[in-house]
Amino acid sequence: CLTDLKERFALCDIQPGAPLVPYRETIVRAEEMRPPANKELGRGAVVATTSSKQVTISLRVQPVPADVTEFLLKNADAIKRLYDRKAKVEESEGEEIAAETDVAAGNTLSVEDFKKQLKEKLESGKGRENWKDRIDKIVAFGPRRTGPNFLIDATADGIFSKAFAAENTTGAAPRAGESLHPSHLADKISYAFQLAAAQGPLCNEPLQGVAVFVEEVTLNLAEDDTSARDKLGRL
């Protein structure tokens, strides 16, 4: 390629630079760390309010164990099949057969085996009490829905639809006359997670090995005649 550029197109000397190596952003737990910004909330926790003051979100982030991150990276195809099956997206019969053939040949895990192995990796090991029974609380993987990061529903009411659930149970737009509920914001929060996982806070590089626990979503809406659907549009 460089020869063609020099001799046929540019007709001048070209100084090639060093190759660009992609990298990922992550968070780590170390023995010596700065004290948390808010001692009451603890490390990795934040309470954020929208500019309209109508929505407050409490969330916490923590590192995903290294072996779990590696497992997710190796099984991106299984995560993709999880979403495809959940959404019942079958573009063609041939693709469905090909996917099942890959599973039968051992090229990719079935959704059931993927969930089983992921649960074992999350819960086995020292200091992983916080991951117990979290497998059924996973809302999404990211970025691009197949990455090595988790969005986890840690709310008391379970406002999110779960990744391993058979179908979506929350997040639908409010019906006429229905009051706005935090679950109506679930898909918006999930989308925000995908954006944040795709562009990290330091260098806008994708995140890797980060779990986001959404602990509470609070609405503070003025009582008026505005419909819930209109309020959701403004939020």
Range-by-range predicted roles:
Residues 1-235:
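Accessory interaction regions appended to the cores of large information-processing enzymes
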